[in-house]
Amino acid sequence: MRRLLFRGLAFEAPPGTLVRLAGANGTGKTSLLRLLTGLMVPDAGEILYKGESITKLREDFHRDLVYIGHMNGVKDDLSARENVRIAARLGNLIVTDSQINEALGAVGLTDFTEHTTGELSQGQRRRVALARLFVSEMKPVWILDEPFTALDVQSVANLSDAVARHVRAGGIVIYTTHQECAVDVPEEKKLTVDVSAFAPKRKKKAQACLGGGDHV
């Protein structure tokens, strides 16, 4: 059975904005991320990017987007290094071995670059997925579902730094997290959207309502 997730939900994230989606489990944070990526389509409202609906700019928008969801999207029969390289190629990025090594090192996988991901723990597989961010800093929009989960203290710090650099360089980062992770960007560049505040007050035919600004 479909259910109404949001009513009257709208926010704007201009370049250089860090958006945290807050709310209890089951309030629709992951669904909202999928809507923002175009993987789901709202029954009403729209998501705008550069002033146009992402349904009209699908190819350009996806070229500018890095999305890391709950599913890691890694291939078990490929090494950690090969997974990062292929993900980069799919994103039209050319990366060197040294860049891949640096990316895997940033998430604590220096000693596992040649291991197939099928040999790795679930937490390590998550880190392989997150290593993509460290070779995708030129992609303007990052949408991340619980990116800090399963990381050690140093990897959390490295990822926080990467997110901060991206925002300070004019990128947009939209993410969910249950962890308190300090991201060093000016307060005026931060936006928290509590999705539970837009939950419907009563049950109706399901629809997802989103409004957008000139960007995401």
Give the location of each predicted region:
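Conserved ABC ATPase signature
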Residues: 77, 116-121
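The feature captures the beta-strand-to-loop junction immediately N-terminal to the Walker
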Residues: 22-24
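Catalytic Walker B motif of ABC-type/P-loop ATPase nucleotide-binding domains
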Residues: 142-146
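Conserved ABC ATPase "signature" region
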Residues: 85, 97-112
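Helix-to-loop junction immediately C-terminal to a conserved catalytic motif
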Residues: 37
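Q-loop/switch helix immediately C-terminal to the Walker
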Residues: 71, 76-92
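Hydrophobic anchor residue at the start of the ABC signature
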Residues: 130, 170
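Conserved ABC transporter NBD signature motif
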Residues: 45-56, 60-61
